[in-house]
Amino acid sequence: MFSKATLFFTTVSRYRDTQAPIPTGQTNQPTTNQCNTGPVQCCDTTQSASDPINIPGMGLVHVSNANGLVAFGNCSPLVSGGSKCNNQAVCCNGTEFNGLVNVGCTNVSL
């Protein structure tokens, strides 16, 4: 025969497992993802990786080991069903300068 404590804990654990998750304030909106490396990014500026980049506050910088395009200036993931990208949508495979510059980018048509 079960003790009262065992019955109590069994009931509480079953009740807890059936409750809805508590909202945390974070939204889990799906991102538009046409890339193998992460979400499609909407960036203010893109240019050839072989050209020096003028980053405000840093001056001209050169990106090493990058092919294709580099993207910089307020890059953010696109959200499905959300706002459209008014600048350039890109798919990138890495970052440099502590995330200020996305490297190895290709244009994405939406």
From Swiss-Prot:
CDD domains: hydrophobin_I. The keyword Signal applies. With its ability to stabilize oil droplets, exhibits a better emulsifying activity than the typical food emulsifiers Tween 20 and sodium caseinate and can be used for the food industry. Transmembrane segments: none annotated. Keywords: Cell wall, Disulfide bond, Secreted, Signal. It is found in: Secreted; Secreted, Cell wall. One of its GO terms (molecular function) is structural constituent of cell wall. Residues 1-27 form the signal peptide. Disulfide bonds join 35-91, 42-85, 43-75, 92-105. InterPro entries: Hydrophobin. GO terms for cellular component: extracellular region; fungal-type cell wall. Aerial growth, conidiation, and dispersal of filamentous fungi in the environment rely upon a capability of their secreting small amphipathic proteins called hydrophobins (HPBs) with low sequence identity. Class I can self-assemble into an outermost layer of rodlet bundles on aerial cell surfaces, conferring cellular hydrophobicity that supports fungal growth, development and dispersal; whereas Class II form highly ordered films at water-air interfaces through intermolecular interactions but contribute nothing to the rodlet structure. Belongs to the fungal hydrophobin family. Self-assembles to form functional amyloid fibrils called rodlets. Self-assembly into fibrillar rodlets occurs spontaneously at hydrophobic:hydrophilic interfaces and the rodlets further associate laterally to form amphipathic monolayers. This is Class I hydrophobin Po.HYD. It comes from Pleurotus ostreatus.
